[in-house]
Amino acid sequence: MNKEERAKRQSKIRNFSIIAHIDHGKSTLADRILEKTNALTQREMKAQLLDSMDLERERGITIKLNAIQLNYKAKDGEEYILHLIDTPGHVDFTYEVSRSLAACEGAILVVDAAQGIEAQTLANVYLALDNNLEILPVINKIDLPSADPERVRQEVEDVIGLDASEAVLASAKAGIGIEEILEQIVEKVPAPTGDSEEPLQCMIFDSLYDPYRGVIAYIRVVNGTVKVGDKVRMMATGKEFEVTEVGVFTPKTTQRDELTVGDVGFLAASIKNVGDTRVGDTITHAKRPAAEPLAGYRKLNPMVFCGLYPIDSARYNDLRDALEKLELNDSALEFEPETSQALGFGFRCGFLGLLHMEILQERIEREFKIDLITTAPSVIYKVFLTNGEDMIVDNPSNMPDPQTIDRVEEPFVKAAIMVPNDYVGAVMEICQGKRGTFIDMQYLDETRVTLTYEIPLSEIVYDFFDQLKSNTKGYASFDYELIGYKPSKLVKMDILLNSEQVDALSFIVHRDSAYDRGKVIVEKLKELIPRQQFEVPIQATIGNKVVARSTIKAMRKNVLAKCYGGDISRKRKLLDKQKEGKKRMKSVGSVEVPQEAFMAVLKMDDN
């Protein structure tokens, strides 16, 4: 293409994404837009087409972002090129959202006509506003009997401050209002700015590993043009590669000769090493590089840590490969090797939240067929010692001796919880039970309230979300952001079996709830550990102090079975002999903790 053709094409490009709270109908709307623009034949169409991972379809949530190119003939008779970038809605995956928004100029904000605005809707809108996107509100599910589009329209104006007078009333399921949405995209979303003659700048917003083609980078071209055969350089790592193919997704990968300004597509350059393409990096030409890289995304810091161990220790290397490949398109995952006496070799991994951790575990078990054991999730604590030093602890087994600790600080989050009036009491109770501090309460309208609390992250990590959902019949929605560290009375609790510490069961807990938590764990282990030939004490300790104890009784053979009547001293002798043997066994015996016992303790509720 020459310069004029490129400029004409650029003026017809519209890059947009769809943002919404979980379950407000985002993936269904994406399906309808694909149908309307004839991206697929009827035969290829299936529900939630862009959710390509099995896990996404099973759970009905979007985890990874997806990009797709559509051609649309608008009412003004012109052909437009639309790039739809699908995003997840769950709080753990906001970084996926911020990545896809950085590649767009506009966003469709989908709000459920029955439920109205939820916490995640707000969080994603603010991300979109930070990226200066044009936001088009769409009120979805208007065919529901409980829909109240006018109330929701008012809510969008009051709560978010967007003009919703032209908001499209739609039903993605019934296919109502889809054309209107497409027309608004064409009219209101600006065409990409940028110059195809400038030095090349492409933003990598995702990447995949293909065993035949190496690493495939998903890119958005901001300036310049990239063709097959070009030598390109990654600006963060300085590595250079020759481009082997470029193309776009029309859901299927379709090869092209070149990608130019505003295009969203993929680039392969037989990149073998996973570490050479960082998400958020800028690609430029090796011969005529751009002066500076694009503003990437900030590196996300993991909030939750846990140990992952292969059940079969021979698969340790497979687990490392699996983590490396997943890290490639999951930039928020971090991991480093660690060992445990109870579980052998494994990795300490950092995640954004519990859902992220669960999804990752499942992906490893499914995609790489590795069975895993996970240790209890923990957060990063700051420990200040009496000698004036301080250290960072993300693993309970690294906690120093209680005598040397001056104070411990833990991360706190500011949680905004949106909830119907009827459940305010229940939510406040949960937050107080989780050591939350009440900050603020605001009424959104007559029926809904936003509660703001400061809560320790370690309490949220555990089962906060489940409790919130189950106590509000699923109506509460919640979003949180880190606000920093504050001192807390925290202690490390160890579990001893037969007076030997089991490192994988140690955890850090608040002093006030230590006794209850210890008691529950000890009882749980008593049920799950099989009886031995000798009696096994299970103790929960803080430092040298035992706070809870329970005993697994020994199995014993009836040694008196062969005595009929007769003298007590004969029986005594046999019983003493048995006792002696049990004592000897106890001093040398070790207790195996079965897999189920680990799992049960880690999944344990506080209640």
Swiss-Prot record:
CDD domains: EF4_II, EF4_III, LepA, lepA_C. It is a peripheral membrane protein. It holds the Pfam family GTP_EFTU_D2. It is found in: Cell membrane. Its main location: membrane. It is an enzyme of class 3 (hydrolase). GO terms for cellular component: plasma membrane. Residues 11-193 form the tr-type G domain. GTP binds at D23, H24, G25, K26, S27, T28, N140, K141, I142, D143. Its EC number is 3.6.5.n1. GO terms for biological process: positive regulation of translation. InterPro entries: EF-4, EFG_III/V, EFG_V-like, EFTu-like_2, G_TR_CS, LepA_C_sf, LepA_CTD, LepA_IV. Gene3D superfamilies: 3.30.70.240, Elongation factor 4, C-terminal domain, Elongation Factor G (Translational Gtpase), domain 3, P-loop containing nucleotide triphosphate hydrolases, Translation factors. It catalyses: GTP + H2O = GDP + phosphate + H(+). GO terms for molecular function: GTP binding; GTPase activity; ribosome binding; translation elongation factor activity. Keywords: Cell membrane, GTP-binding, Hydrolase, Membrane, Nucleotide-binding, Protein biosynthesis. Required for accurate and efficient protein synthesis under certain stress conditions. May act as a fidelity factor of the translation reaction, by catalyzing a one-codon backward translocation of tRNAs on improperly translocated ribosomes. Back-translocation proceeds from a post-translocation (POST) complex to a pre-translocation (PRE) complex, thus giving elongation factor G a second chance to translocate the tRNAs correctly. Binds to ribosomes in a GTP-dependent manner. PANTHER family: TRANSLATION FACTOR GUF1 HOMOLOG, CHLOROPLASTIC, TRANSLATION FACTOR GUF1-RELATED. Belongs to the TRAFAC class translation factor GTPase superfamily. Classic translation factor GTPase family. LepA subfamily. This is Elongation factor 4. It comes from Bacillus anthracis.
